[in-house]
Amino acid sequence: MQAKATAKFVRVSPRKARLVAQNVKGKPVEDAMNILRFTPQKAGGLIFKVMHSALANAEQLPGIDVDAMVVKQVIINEGPTWKRFLPRSMGRANRILKRTSHITVILEES
């Protein structure tokens, strides 16, 4: 049986979040949460919160052993990009892209 949690419009670049997500795929939930807890990147804490939510969702399902859960998938999709402008000299402007992500964590009983 599977448990799933999603966080949308998270203010982290999908490219950077995918680098962190690769470290926890296929691992037991306890090990994955320890890895994320001590990851210095911002995405580590955000994925940790989504994984914690998925674990809480799994506790609500009947007949699930929460201690035997494994990270089946961590999906990082690209959300909308916020466009901002940074004023430069001589009346010019540079575009700043503030990227967002949709983070989905799927846990499965091993």
From Swiss-Prot:
GO molecular function: rRNA binding; structural constituent of ribosome
Example GO BP: translation
Keyword Ribonucleoprotein appears in the UniProt entry: yes
Domain of life: Bacteria
SUPFAM superfamilies: Ribosomal protein L22 (SSF54843)
GO CC annotation: cytosolic large ribosomal subunit
Keyword terms: Ribonucleoprotein, Ribosomal protein, RNA-binding, rRNA-binding
InterPro entries recorded: Ribosomal_uL22, Ribosomal_uL22_bac/chlpt-type, Ribosomal_uL22_bac/org-type, Ribosomal_uL22_CS, Ribosomal_uL22_sf
Family membership: Belongs to the universal ribosomal protein uL22 family.
Function (record text): This protein binds specifically to 23S rRNA; its binding is stimulated by other ribosomal proteins, e.g. L4, L17, and L20. It is important during the early stages of 50S assembly. It makes multiple contacts with different domains of the 23S rRNA in the assembled 50S subunit and ribosome. The globular domain of the protein is located near the polypeptide exit tunnel on the outside of the subunit, while an extended beta-hairpin is found that lines the wall of the exit tunnel in the center of the 70S ribosome.
Assembly information from the UniProt record: Part of the 50S ribosomal subunit.
Protein name as catalogued: Large ribosomal subunit protein uL22
